[in-house]
Regions:
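Extreme N-terminal starter segment of soluble prokaryotic enzymes
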Residues: 1-4
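Glycine-rich Rossmann-fold phosphate-binding loop(s) that bind the pyrophosphate
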Residues: 8-9
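Internal alpha-helical scaffold of NAD(P)-dependent oxidoreductase catalytic cores
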Residues: 100-105, 121-158, 168-209, 253-257
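NAD(P)-dependent Rossmann-like dehydrogenase/reductase catalytic/cofactor-binding core
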Residues: 194-261
């Protein structure tokens, strides 16, 4: 499969990183980018650079649109002007298919940065999910992690807030945890990052063993104990409400981006 990325921002870099780690050859990946710093990074990674006007002659299986929302619709038109038969996957958040000039040839995707190490979760939506292009999109993102085909496009806003943005919300919580861990004095032989990484990986292992958060919490807390005191503090601070509002804010921003186009 030969693919081309139009734009080389964070999410494009994550996807490409995951594809290369999955065994895809760099010879099968091309990029279109104007930013000089990113061009230098492309050269460091030995990725092929092409020009937009050469798209048609390259005969790519998929073209991934990975530009800023404000540039997405103009760039999409330029792509189809250059290569009218293209199948385009957009990773741009918030912009509905009907905003594009050729929605029947566009597949919406919402990957997250965990694609870089094969642990990504990507949501896909297209009007025709039985098409060859959609099947190729599933094959492509399956190299970078787990793929979900959404039943309707409206779900993409919430998927964006939970999967696309949600990692950052949890990172914010873990950042607080790390700051608290740094207050403890360890012997020189103890590596703080190793301790933290061990803790974080244990969370996933615990859930794999027991996929019920209430049971996991009950295994740790005891009546009148330290965990109970901390949990009551979180409840008094309305932590659940804070997270729900964060997800809602991200979802609403996705809707706003769509309405701005």
């Amino acid at each position: 499969m030969n693919i081309c990325f139009v734009g080389f921002g964070n999410i494009a870099q994550a996807i490409i990183g995951g594809l290369l780690k999955s065994g895809m050859s760099s010879e099968n990946i091309a990029c279109i980018e104007r930013n000089q710093q990113k061009i230098a990074l492309l050269k460091e990674k030995n990725l092929r650079m092409i020009q937009l006007e050469n798209l048609a002659s390259e005969n790519f299986d998929l073209i991934l649109l990975a530009v800023k929302p404000k540039d997405a619709l103009r760039t999409e038109k330029d792509i189809f002007d250059s290569a009218p038969k293209s199948i385009l996957i957009t990773v741009v958040a918030g912009i509905a298919l009907n905003k594009y000039s050729r929605p029947g040839s566009v597949i919406r995707s919402m990957p997250n940065t965990a694609c870089a190490f094969g642990k990504g979760i990507t949501g896909l939506y297209a009007d025709d999910q039985k098409s060859h292009g959609f099947k190729n999109a599933i094959k492509l993102f399956s190299r970078t992690g787990y793929v979900l085909a959404l039943e309707n496009e409206g779900e993409m806003h919430r998927f964006t807030s939970i999967i696309g943005s949600g990692q950052a919300f949890l990172f914010q919580v873990l950042k607080v945890y790390l700051l608290e861990l740094e207050k403890i004095s360890f012997n020189d032989g103890n590596n703080l990052n190793d301790v933290f990484n061990h803790f974080v990986s244990s969370l996933g292992d615990s859930f794999a063993e027991e996929p019920d958060f209430e049971n996991l919490i009950n295994r740790i807390k005891s009546p009148g104990g330290t965990t109970q005191a901390g949990l009551e503090s979180l409840e008094n601070s309305e932590l659940d409400k804070i997270f729900r509002e964060a997800f809602e804010a991200a979802k609403n921003r996705s809707i706003e981006i769509s309405n701005e186009q």
